[in-house]
Regions:
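Non-heme Fe(II)/2-oxoglutarate
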Residues: 1-86
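Catalytic core of non-heme Fe(II) oxygenases with the double-stranded beta-helix
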Residues: 77-189
Length: 189
């Protein structure tokens, strides 16, 4: 049996890893995940920056429930492969639900620049067109945009949580919510 290689891209921003892996979740699993989050009740409680009046829609996931899900197993397998000499504990899990017109800000998931923590973002969709926009932009420590990662069904982005980044809102022509499953992983010391 021939195993197909998935597309993978490795970058470094100020010495911190940013890894993009395609097709981590596909087929029926992606369809089920997308259907679930499309219908799940969201809460407008999240903010990209401290003190912001804007709130973003998220679908919280209890940690003990997230740990038992096939998507978490697939993501953690990739984390283990790409960070082989490190171990992580799932600290938080939720799905971002971003729509046209949402205001998003550049932020770091961990403010400490030396943090070894990792954020995993899985784009949850059965289809995403290029003209729908929604790219995630990654910045260096000087605030310069260094990489843009396009949303793509089943695409996983692993990055050190200290990398500043900003999610992109979908364009006006997009009739869907941009869903990204986020796992915040604490590095075990």
């Amino acid at each position: 049996m021939i195993e197909l290689m998935r597309a993978r891209y490795d970058f470094r921003i100020d010495g911190r890893e940013l890894i993009v892996i395609d097709d981590v979740v596909t087929g029926a699993r992606m369809e089920n995940l997308a259907s679930f989050f499309d219908l799940a009740p969201a809460q407008r409680i999240e903010s990209d920056i401290t003190g912001a009046d804007t709130r973003l829609w998220i679908i919280p996931i209890e940690r003990d429930i997230a740990e038992k899900q096939p998507y978490t197993t697939a993501i953690m397998s990739e984390v283990g492969e790409h960070f082989p000499n490190e171990t992580f504990t799932l600290e938080r899990a939720y799905c971002n639900a971003i729509a046209y017109g949402d205001m998003l800000y550049a932020h770091r998931d961990r403010r400490e620049c030396e943090s070894r923590d990792v954020t995993a973002l899985l784009f949850v969709a059965t289809e995403w067109k290029r003209d729908w926009d929604g790219e995630t932009i990654f910045f260096n420590d000087d605030g310069e945009a260094m990489h843009a990662v396009s949303p793509r069904p089943g695409r996983l982005v692993l990055f050190r949580s200290a990398i500043e980044h900003r999610a992109g809102a979908p364009s006006r022509v997009c009739n869907r919510t941009r869903l990204t499953l986020a796992l915040k992983l604490r590095a075990n010391r």
